[in-house]
Structure formats: C-alpha cells, structure tokens
C-alpha cells in the first residue's frame, strides 16, 4: 500500500479535494499533539487530547520491538509505522515484553538485554516522528515471548513452590517481578525522554488477554488488576492504564453474553477498578464460536460489540477500544473478500458509536506484518502491500475517523 490510499468517490471533484485536505490537516494536528507533549486522557466515555475529542484507528504489530532490535530488520518496523502514518492511522498496539528464551528483553528478573531495549526505544522514537500513539503491553498471558509461565518458572528457579501458571496472579514473588519490570522508568536513549514522560505512549496495558482458569469466580484476577493498575499509576500518573481484556463477562453480570464459557475475568468488575482508565475487547468469533456458520459468527460479533459499547457507557462510564479483531485465513470458508466484509462490519460499529457520542472510540485489527515475515504468520496477518482491498478498507475507516476529530 505504501503512501497511497484509495480515494472514496464523492459527488464533485471539489468535495474530494476538500475532504482529502481536511483529513490531512486533521492528521497533521494529531501529529502535532504527539510532538508537542499532549498526553491522551479519558474523560467520561471519551478520549481527549489537548482537551479535544480523540478517536482512533490502527492495528496491532506485536513484533515491532523484536525486529527493531536487529539493525538488519529495523526497516521492517520503520516501514510499518510509515504505512500507519500514510493511512492516517493514529494508534498502534505492540509488545513491551519478551521474557526469557531467545533474544529476550528481560533475561531474568530485573536483568535486561540492552539491544532489545534499544529496539523499543527506536519504535517509540519512530512513532513519535510520525504522529502515532502506541499502546504498550507489559506481559503476556500466553506462552509467546515468555508470558506468565516464564515468571512462574523464574520463581520456581529461586526455590518457590508454585503450582500452576495462574500463580502468576497470586504469588507475592511473581507480583514483585512484575512491579520490578523496568519499562515504565526506562529513559529512551534516542529521544532522551523517560517512557513515563513520553506522550507518544497512549496507554499501558497490564497484560495481554489475561485469563485465570483456576479461579473462574474472578476474585484472583480482580485482586491482581486492582493491585497492578494502582501500582502502574503510582509510578506513572501521566499515562492511561487498561487491562488487556478480551471482554469476557463474569459473576457481576451478563455471563450469558459470553460464547459459552468464562475465563476468570469480569468485564464489568475488572474495568470498574478506579485506576483503569478505559475498557477493551477483542473479537474472534472464528475461534470462539468456531462451529457456527460465517453469518452466525458475524452476528455474534455484532452483538458482542453492541453489548460492550452499551455497558461501557451505561455501567462503566468509560471509553472502549476494540484492541484486537481479525479473521483467520485458516478458518473454514475464508476469502479475502470475506475478511474485508468482516473488517467493514467492525468498522461500521466503531464509527457509528464514535459519531453518535458513544463509548467506542476506535478499533485495532490483528495484525499487520511486513514483507519477508512469512515465518511469523498466524493466519490473521495482513501485509498491506499485498492486500490492496483490505488496505483500502482500513484507509476508508481512517479517513472517516479523522473526520470526527475537530481541527
């Protein structure tokens, strides 16, 4: 896709020119907000930047730090961030963790790989140059890049008797490991700005997709979220905090809205924690209701979004972001046209909410990859240069979202 985008045809050439010029000016204003030190805030059910409403569109690229840590692959990270700016996206979500294993950020508790940290420095600096905000996730629930499993193993290596990976949420040892993770106070060696003082960071995410199957009551995760959200805020009061939830309901209300099971989270109770600034959901009906038809899966997604948008406004009174959604090429009946239609359906729901002053203020699809990353594919990847129709859908949403933000 590069720096090109599809022009949506309007009745007259003059209107087309004015619309494109307005969108460019809006993105230039958002870029200036990042450059001029404007932190994103949550105000009621809206995000604001510099006192003005802020709406977002963008994507996930979890691998940015990893690729940027290798000078030979750094262009992949820079190229994808440039694509985001060219599309007039405003927000990218990525990992600020890699625990143990091959080329880690954190080799062992509190011991860091400077090359990997320099990769994260580079990502933040490049995002800032392009007027992009970043959501940085601090640890993984899953085994990829270490995750809670690695934290538990580190505790065991020190002689602590932890039974399951879910003890990550309960053990004082692993909780201290988490608190000691030095990302928040890192001083970027490219910009000279501490992460906690850098407005390029939109929000900290406590953990990617937390689940606690050993305590489906939700009490374990509720206690952990309360403690860690408060801790992150105590170290960094400048930035917003979100949990990283997929959106599964729990004991407080609406368990019947789940896709047939619970995972130890509680969308309502977890997000009502005062130190949590906004709610998130993910949407993967091709996984969660895999036995349903494509039409039934899309219907589930529509209801999933509508329920969470309503509850974010009426119960939480906080903004909502769809921080992951996608459609896998490995799903039955997949076509690029079907994926594009799914993206449009998600985007229409996001846009309708944002336009009408609802709680949902943006969506980030999973995920963008750069050319030459074939070994990283998971079925959900979008290589924008090779997926023109999907890139057009994304560009159209970016333009619509930009049009909602006052100049």
Curated annotation (Swiss-Prot):
Pfam families: Cellulase. Coiled coil: none annotated. It is found in: Secreted. Transmembrane segments: none annotated. Substrate binds at residues 95, 208, 284, 366. The active site is at residues 209, 324. GO terms for cellular component: extracellular region. Expression not detected. Residues 1-31 form the signal peptide. GO terms for biological process: polysaccharide catabolic process. Keywords: Glycosidase, Hydrolase, Secreted, Signal. GO terms for molecular function: mannan endo-1,4-beta-mannosidase activity. InterPro entries: Glyco_hydro_5, Glycoside_hydrolase_SF, MAN-like. It comes from the Eukaryota. It catalyses: Random hydrolysis of (1->4)-beta-D-mannosidic linkages in mannans, galactomannans and glucomannans. Its EC number is 3.2.1.78. Belongs to the glycosyl hydrolase 5 (cellulase A) family. This is Putative mannan endo-1,4-beta-mannosidase 9. The lineage of its organism: Eukaryota, Viridiplantae, Streptophyta, Embryophyta, Tracheophyta.
